[in-house]
Amino acid sequence: METYVAALDQGTTSSRAILFNRAGEIVARAQYPFRQIYPQPGWVEHDPMEIWATEKRALAEAVDSAHIDPKRIAAVGITNQRETTILWDRATGQPVYNAIVWQCRRTAPICDRLAADGLGETVTDKTGLLIDAYFSGTKIKWLLDNVPGVRERAERGELCAGTVDSWLIWQLTGGCVHVTDYSNASRTMLFNIHTLQWDEDLCHALGIPMQLLPEPRPNSEPYGVIAENIPGLEALAGIPICGSAGDQPAALFGQACFTPGQAKNTYGTGCFTLMNVGAEPVRSKAGLVTSVGWSVNGRTTYALEGSVFNAGSTIQWLRDELGLIGTAPECDRLAESVPDAGGVYIVPAFTGLGAPYWDMYARGTIVGLTRVTTKAHIARAVLDAIAFQVTDLVRAMNDDAPCPLTTLRVDGGASVSDILMQTQADLLRLPVDRPAQVETTAFGAAALAGLATGVWGSMEELERLRLSQHVFLPRRDEAACAVDYAQWRRAVKRSRSWIENEL
């Protein structure tokens, strides 16, 4: 009898549920978008109740459309947008404020004060991160300091804090389980990646009561079961929740990057390059960060990571704000209609620059416009910008890693773009390997849950499931690529520190 694993893939713009069989094949899926809330420039929020409602609806629909007996679902795994932060009432399960999203830059002044206080080295030594508004710690502090009554309620033990994994597990278990996994915890700026515990000194420095925080747990073990009487999920009551990982380490796991030195890039709302660095964390000297990749069977694997904030979101900007395209695939068609971007460079620093620059005050820039620039050139420049940013990350990674990268595995929505993948291979001078199963993030969560319940017996078995769909090899002249990349770096300089004096 076939056995299935359900993965909840809670992303920045939509909530998805995917059902996998033992061969790693997709049996059913469902997806629902939710609102993006922008209260002020540089601020990004989500409604936590919309996150829960859309994820619950997606799970129910995926199971229903599969036409299977829900009792054949062995486990549920969760993967999620990381760093996005929620505070909620422990008794009612109601959020006290909207979720503050990973892209939100409202806490940049808090980060500046922490850096001025000399906390930077301590943060890096203990957490593997840099002080930046990207991470959850300053988001929790902002909520405590700015939402009336929240600090007092937190100190009385009435509230819970967590990233989206914690929120979903809490809701799925009917408020019985308040946990997070090591990979999500390691993105808070509060978690010691050496001891795998919340760091008391860092919590004190940020004024965060430790009783707010969820219990950190390994990535592949039982956390709880789906509660009875959840509207729409009654048939799933009792199914164990056994796997959890942030979206990027889940993709690294789903890509079967189990050997140190293997790396992947996910082309989603942002771009995220992760390399497996093995059992010991690597301290970056090139503007990258180190996080927990996963902890399975008592063994913790660390990942070196570079993150850029705007990739697929730049294509959405072309569609939704500029109206230059009607659908995302039109960006490819436009870009393919011209041989290059015509000297146009776009730096999509809409919410600052991530790795390796870490500039909270950078803003988006378009340079090189002339009267002959067309919307096709703009579309090509958008795809180029995504590839340039990943090139920045891989170059930094090669500076830090014990040995240079030899192949980049890719996934995420924009990885279906042949023109983008070819541009990426040209700029990196490396093979770019696109898998047959592009839903690697969701499969990573399913794999972690399936390992915990015996659906898959080993990581070697999971590795055999990964197949390549296409490998892109460098084709363009190397010297021309080098000139293009140098121009990109010039454009980046023009975007730096753009609004520093305005905050």
Map each language-model feature to its residues.
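Active-site core segments that coordinate phosphate-bearing ligands/cofactors
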Residues: 6-8, 22, 108, 114-178, ...
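A conserved helix-loop-beta module that forms one wall/lid of the active-site cleft
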Residues: 206-221
